[in-house]
């Protein structure tokens, strides 16, 4: 049984707090797991979880699977510790202060499995972050509550809906992005999708993710006073 030993996971904070002397000028940002692979510039193969092919790039962002026909709107981060049964022990942490907007605790209700969405209203714009395939959700994490940077949200796992993720490939699916509309339910109803929307506006169809690694890289380089700086640098899709 996984225990939530601390409200904040200090080592995860320290790994990023010391990245730059200018950190105080930017919004706080921490990596969502104890993995130090990104912070220490290790090869992605050491910290990205492949999707079954053995190719670590399939755990990255973008058209990295099925010959580019399937878009992966986040990154998949490997665990760094497991129990004697092989289950991940890694805590999953809020990358920045925010509000819990959605918790899907029934894995079968989404391909994300058991997942949490945070909104970060103190940032410009108010981005969302998503934490998926969780094994457990921390008992003090509930919809509507505020969370702090580095607060433990749950435990990494391999929960899913409609397909199976083997325990050996357990990971955190992590997203950063923007919600397309706050009127998603009305759009969903007009489209007559044929099924119930259990996730309000935090349904994956309404979430527009950006590359989390690129976002973190820009932050580390001191080029993001606010997330808006990142979006200003994105190429226009035509």
Region spans (language model):
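N-terminal export leaders
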Residues: 1-10
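Hydrophobic h-region of N-terminal signal peptides that target proteins for export
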Residues: 14-23
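Surface-exposed, glycine-biased beta-strand/turn segments
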Residues: 23-114, 199-238
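Intrinsically disordered, low-complexity boundary segments flanking structured domains
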Residues: 59-66, 117-121, 141, 163
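Conserved, short, structured surface segments that act as functional micro-motifs
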Residues: 77, 110-118, 145-223
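Short, well-ordered turn and helix-capping elements at secondary-structure junctions
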Residues: 79-83, 104, 135-138, 157-160
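Short, well-ordered loop/turn sites that connect or cap secondary structure elements
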Residues: 95, 141, 146-147
């Amino acid at each position: 049984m996984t225990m939530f030993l601390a409200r904040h996971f200090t080592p995860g904070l320290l790994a990023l707090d010391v990245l730059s002397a200018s950190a105080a000028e930017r919004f706080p940002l921490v990596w969502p797991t104890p993995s130090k692979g990104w912070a220490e510039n290790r090869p992605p193969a050491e910290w990205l979880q492949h999707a079954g092919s053995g190719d670590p790039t399939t755990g990255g962002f973008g058209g990295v699977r099925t010959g580019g026909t399937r878009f992966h709107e986040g990154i998949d981060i490997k665990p760094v510790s497991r129990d004697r049964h092989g289950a991940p022990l890694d805590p999953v942490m809020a990358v920045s202060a925010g509000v819990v907007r959605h918790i899907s605790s029934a894995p079968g209700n989404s391909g994300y499995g058991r997942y949490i969405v945070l909104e970060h209203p103190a940032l410009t714009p108010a981005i969302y972050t998503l934490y998926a395939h969780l094994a457990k959700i921390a008992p003090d994490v509930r919809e509507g509550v505020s969370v702090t940077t580095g607060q433990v949200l749950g435990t990494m796992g391999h929960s899913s809906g409609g397909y199976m993720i083997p325990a050996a490939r357990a990971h955190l699916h992590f997203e950063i992005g923007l919600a397309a509309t706050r009127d998603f339910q009305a759009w969903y109803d007009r489209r007559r999708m044929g099924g119930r929307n259990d996730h309000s506006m935090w349904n994956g169809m309404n979430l527009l993710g950006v590359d989390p690694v690129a976002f973190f890289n820009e932050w580390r380089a001191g080029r993001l006073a606010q997330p808006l700086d990142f979006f200003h640098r994105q190429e226009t899709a035509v």
